[in-house]
């Protein structure tokens, strides 16, 4: 992460403020502005953690804050340590520690061994802007607290950022949920991460989720989640990427489209290719439609690329989906509170009935994709090549990017879809 100091702004400062709040160094306004209160909290944190107290958040201070970014600490066992004393030191619980450390024997702690200690707050924040760095912290935190959740890479973005996936379950049936093919639809990232966290917790504690036994879902279905398909674009829209070669190139591209606000109107990957127009399912028709609208070269949105799958993010999703061969996919977008369920005349078995179930639990409407945007999408390609149920979920209402204040409603509306997707 970049160095933060007095006068810094942006989502990295929001995350810093959140971490300081979590660590009880002041109730800070999460406004993304590194002002006097934030600096004073940093100074107190540095002083109490044996760091140089200069009020500047450099590599050493970031490292010290990682437990409050990720939601877990690592504790090296000392003589006379017990799980009780370790839990008390961090405000954790014995059960949380046992879940995070399968096989750990409380009566046989080895001096020098390392214990993962969950901290007493939710991992996934729902009140700040998301970035690729925050996504990675959440992925790490979920996997550490709930080690039955497996994590890995779908691939890499243009800028080399990891396209993460998480998976949970041991059933033969596989489903695949993904979000943020479009940069300014980044609010869908915490939707999927929060679902993963809630589901993992419900399974670990023997609880239900949306009225269903998490254990039964876990035994029946393996849920795969790719929370952020376009991390470079998300960083551009949320303000984390605000300088450098890639930013300047995106700014030059956007200058050719003055009617699209920059960076808030940016949907594409960092090279100006719309990732949800990159799949080999009527790509030529998508090209005709978008060229007719004037999107003939890299753009903030709607440019189909020079050929299908030239964007590394789309290629990675394509290859990963082929290897996974899921029974059902959900592609999360915003906005409109709409469920798109078919591609051309393809209607996989039960796909309409499943869509109607999703509508019933969410309040969303079921509609056909408009012709002008009805080709070359991820959902379109999946239905065409697999002949299995695939859905684009347009969450929330308003102008993209939707404000994080909509998160609670969006999540409540979509929890049933995410659970039923693993059951139908």
List where the protein language model places each region.
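C-terminal accessory segments enriched in acidic
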Residues: 78, 83, 95, 111, ...
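Extracellular-facing binding/remodeling surfaces
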Residues: 1-2, 18-31
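Conserved hydrophobic/aromatic packing and binding residues within compact polymer-binding modules
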Residues: 17, 42-45, 97
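Short glycine- and acidic-rich boundary segments immediately preceding or forming the N-terminal edge
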Residues: 3, 85, 96, 116-162
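Active-site/substrate-binding loop(s) of hydrolase catalytic cores
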Residues: 172, 186-187, 192-196, 200-340, ...
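Primarily a LysM-type cell-wall glycan-binding module
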Residues: 8-18, 31-36, 67-91, 113, ...
